[in-house]
A protein has these predicted regions:
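Intrinsically disordered, low-complexity acidic regions enriched in Pro/Ser/Thr
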Residues: 1-123
Length: 123
């Protein structure tokens, strides 16, 4: 099992690296992107309506946690890539067997899917 962070990247990307991270996102025209950031693959997507609180569920619709979003973005990354822990709760750090960021995606309704977990951002 791999520990995985799901949530707003602003809570886990170091302050010294935040601008560089944002520049990498701004250089991409898609609403979702997978890229290498400082040696770690990360999936980043825009939420449907920007900032807010979004719920993380598993495939049985069990509420796992609530994700605060202040940058209008959600990310999925290995916990090894976390640079800081700023205001995240246990619901944001989950275990995914054989985690591979290439298997993370969002659909046309801005619902994020990562393994058996999902986050709907279109309310």
């Amino acid at each position: 099992m791999n520990r995985v962070y799901i949530g707003d990247p602003c809570y886990v990307i170091g302050d010294d690296n935040w601008q560089n991270f944002c520049d990498m996102i701004d250089n991409n025209d898609n609403s979702q992107v997978i890229f290498d950031f400082m040696g770690h693959n990360i999936f980043v997507m825009q939420t449907k309506y920007g900032d807010g609180v979004y719920e993380l569920f598993d495939d049985k619709y069990t509420l796992i946690g609530k994700l605060c979003v202040d940058s209008g973005l959600l990310c999925v990354m290995s916990f090894d890539g976390v640079q800081k822990i700023d205001g995240i709760d246990d619901g944001c750090v989950i275990e995914i067997k054989d985690f591979n960021v290439d298997n993370v995606y969002s659909d046309e309704n801005a619902t994020l899917f990562a393994g058996k977990y999902f986050v709907k951002t279109d309310y």
